[in-house]
Amino acid sequence: MDKQQFLAEYQDVFKEPGKDVFFSPGRINVIGEHTDYNGGHVFPCAISIGTYGVYGPREDTTVAIYSANSAKEEDSKIITFDINDTEPQNAKDEKWVNYFKGMLVYLKQRGFKIDHGFNLYIHGFLPYGSGLSSSASIEMLMGNILKDEFNLDIDEIELVKLGQKTENDFVGLNSGIMDQFAVGMGKENNAIYLDCNTLEYKYLPLELGDYEIIIMSTNKNHSLAGSKYNERVQECEEAVKRLNKKLDINKLGELDSDTFDQYTYLIDDDTLIRRARHAVSENERTKKAIDAMEKGDLEELGRLINASHVSLKYDYEVTGKELDTLAENAWNQPGCLGARMVGGGFAGSAIAIVKKSEAENFKKNVGKIYRDKIGYDASFYDAEVVDGPHKL
């Protein structure tokens, strides 16, 4: 779809021309899962599948939002709120609007002048609950539209922080900053090596040669805010609290494996030990993956990606039958260097690094196994690594 098509869709809904069209990407994370809120390292990139938004200013103080994605539902409607309303939408069919509303609320709280309403038409191509950061894509889309329309003097990293605040405080999910950072700071053909504790980062070319990344969606929805995601955050915080009987740390990402092994006895709970062990070992795997990328050692990268999935399955327990079926059967396919779940888990998506010449057979074989075992189809996506949010 092109810019004119989105403008035409906006006009169909709001009966007047739209002003501008923006795109905000989704993201995948090559490695470093559930490490962001633990103060560790991650290695994500922005992808060409994302969210498009068309907006047009209004003369009153009403914000009116329409989603083409909810148009498939019988109760599709334009949802409205006032720019001075600071409370989350509570109706079940309106909660998705809070990702937009939170950004507006927190920008106004920061003292930015947002003095009129607007209409907003949304068309997302990231399946909701796919683990590809549809929520961060929406937050950064909204932030960049507001920045453009109201000439806000704010840089992208500050918008990223407000995106995380929206997720944490307005929506109620205790996530780290990786998703918003990956989306907001995306750079074409590069992944971002990010220290989530300090926000120090560097771009690394995602040079895979004869290989490509294939996204595999379980087509099973996950709702992180209603899942065990927040429980994992709390378990890691409790592990830190127990380790601090002898140590002085704020996050598990501050530990290496040797130090963790030395003081594991302080945690004194098998479940908490496994949760913390994942956070520490995944952080180390991410650092090793960067070394492998810089040396061009894709086979080592693949091994680390596989080990990440194993840790997420057994120590962190966030995979599930669908994700395990995709990742573990991907491992057995010709030309696959590595595969693992991505995102929060509990369904959603996995990624695989696959030889380009084997890609079609890979999709066919893994797809058949998944359908036979799970009972419905998985979806497979090829995505390019792209820049962050921008105006078309």
From Swiss-Prot:
GO terms for biological process: galactose metabolic process. The record marks R27 as: Transition state stabilizer. Substrate binds at E33, H34, T35, D36, Y229. It is found in: Cytoplasm. Mg(2+) binds at S135, E167. One of its GO terms (cellular component) is cytosol. It catalyses: alpha-D-galactose + ATP = alpha-D-galactose 1-phosphate + ADP + H(+). It is an enzyme of class 2 (transferase). ATP binds at S67, G129, S130, G131, L132, S133, S134, S135. Its EC number is 2.7.1.6. Keywords: ATP-binding, Carbohydrate metabolism, Cytoplasm, Galactose metabolism, Kinase, Magnesium, Metal-binding, Nucleotide-binding, Transferase. InterPro entries: Galactokinase, Galactokinase_bac, Galactokinase_CS, GalKase_N, GHMP_kinase_C_dom, GHMP_kinase_C_sf, GHMP_kinase_N_dom, GHMP_knse_ATP-bd_CS. It holds the Pfam family GHMP_kinases_C. The active site is at D179 (proton acceptor). GO terms for molecular function: ATP binding; galactokinase activity; magnesium ion binding. Pathway: Carbohydrate metabolism; galactose metabolism. PROSITE patterns: GALACTOKINASE, GHMP_KINASES_ATP. Belongs to the GHMP kinase family. GalK subfamily. NCBIfam families: gal_kin, PRK05322.1. Catalyzes the transfer of the gamma-phosphate of ATP to D-galactose to form alpha-D-galactose-1-phosphate (Gal-1-P). This is Galactokinase. The gene is galK.
